[in-house]
Amino acid sequence: MRNLPGGGTLAGMETAFTELIGCRVPVQLAPMGGMCTPELAAAVANGGGAAMLSLPLTTPAEVAATLDEVDRLTAGPVGVSFLVPFLDRECLAVAAARSPLLDFFYGDPDPELVAAGHAHGALVSWQVGSAAEARAAVAAGCDVVVAQGTEAGGRHRGGLPLATQKG
């Protein structure tokens, strides 16, 4: 796992998320495909947050090159997000061995994918769009559940705003 520059958290900002991920503020950059460049991810990580890269339809060599660039720009926590329908297991292995956090989206929570991430030492999160999907992510062994309602914009799985979801 990466060490965060400056160490510690901001006073009063300690949460289970900051402790688990190793960031200073409980903010995670959404893994917006094409928008989350190594430079943006590094800016978020260097500012104390957790950053995510979306790397769909890439090769293992491209994943490694992107993570090399991230390593050059930050020592902060930068994870990699995968769209389940386009998942390449070799890319997953490269990312899991080099990133503190893997994120999955657009697929039902899958215990095998969670176990694959954990086997390489990564934490695993799953983006969900309903309370039922959140329960499935917990049952699959995810370390983090990212609840996303329709107000998130972009692609989402849920059909309701997050505030209307009941547990």
Kindly give the residue locations of the regions a language model identified.
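Active-site entrance/lid segments in N-terminal catalytic domains of soluble metabolic enzymes
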Residues: 7-167
